[in-house]
């Protein structure tokens, strides 16, 4: 299912190894269903000795993975809270900053450099890419707008300098044709905080419904200078034009490593 996944393992006896294998089978089975809904990327699971049930198979946070160097990284939980992974060193996604779904357990110990110390049970990157301008979209021929729905969900949110969207569209279902998704800025000269989500089926069939998850970096928008503004999102739905508003504040610090993250979603996106 995840041919490029990296799995961190502890030394264990044969009995524990069998138990962990059964646990991972359950996790992979459940995550297969989850990825067909959310189009997830590079899966990394961290084995432990506790079988705490199915709760740990579900994501309990959407984070930004921020590499510090090759040996360390931290996770931004929202605009204000940072997490230090106690059981991981270098980012499993390399030098790229990415958005990711994760399941973590908060530890009682204190972190010296961040707000919370956590144990990462598993983490899975999502497609992360920069927003583009109207001029860039036209120059690259990214003007097509096939119908799509934005799903009201806890992962559909503007935070930490990103707009993360769960969207719903029709797919052929054979994972052969990538759908193209982009966020375009500068669509309204009178409102620099209005952006447009564009979805291109790229000639894919329209046989089944499926959901995708994508995060767009918003560092090209004007600095809100610490204030919270309304970010307006527009898109072409199956019933006509729609829009939604999000609370948005420019990220206080900008780290290197922008650009498109190399991920391998279950539903193919670009």
PLM regions and their residue ranges:
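Cys/His-rich zinc-coordinating "finger/knuckle" motifs
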Residues: 53
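Bacterial signal peptide processing site
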Residues: 47-50
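Bacterial N-terminal signal peptides that target proteins for export
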Residues: 23-33
């Amino acid at each position: 299912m995840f041919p490029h996944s990296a799995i961190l393992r502890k030394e264990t006896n044969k009995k524990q190894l069998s138990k962990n294998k059964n646990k991972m089978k359950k996790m992979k089975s459940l995550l297969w269903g989850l990825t067909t809904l959310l189009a997830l990327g590079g899966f990394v699971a961290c084995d432990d000795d506790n079988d705490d049930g199915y709760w740990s198979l579900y994501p309990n946070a959407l984070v930004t993975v921020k590499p510090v160097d090759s040996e360390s990284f931290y996770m931004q939980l929202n605009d204000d809270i940072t997490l230090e992974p106690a059981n991981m060193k270098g980012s499993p996604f390399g030098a790229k900053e990415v958005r990711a779904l994760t399941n973590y357990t908060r530890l009682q110990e204190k972190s010296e450099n961040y707000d919370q110390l956590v144990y990462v049970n598993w983490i899975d990157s999502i497609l992360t890419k920069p927003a583009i301008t109207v001029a860039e979209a036209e120059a690259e021929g990214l003007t097509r707008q096939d119908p799509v729905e934005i799903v009201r969900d806890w992962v559909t949110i503007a935070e930490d300098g990103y707009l993360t969207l769960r969207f719903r569209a029709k797919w052929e279902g054979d994972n052969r044709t990538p759908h193209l998704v982009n966020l375009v800025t500068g669509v309204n000269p009178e409102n620099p905080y209005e952006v447009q989500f564009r979805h291109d089926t790229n000639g894919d069939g329209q046989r089944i419904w499926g959901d995708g998850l994508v995060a767009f970096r918003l560092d090209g928008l004007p600095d809100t200078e610490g204030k919270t503004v309304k970010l307006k999102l527009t898109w072409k739905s199956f019933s006509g034009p729609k829009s939604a508003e999000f609370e948005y504040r420019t990220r206080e610090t900008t780290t290197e490593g922008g650009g498109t993250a190399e991920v391998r979603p279950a539903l193919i996106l670009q």
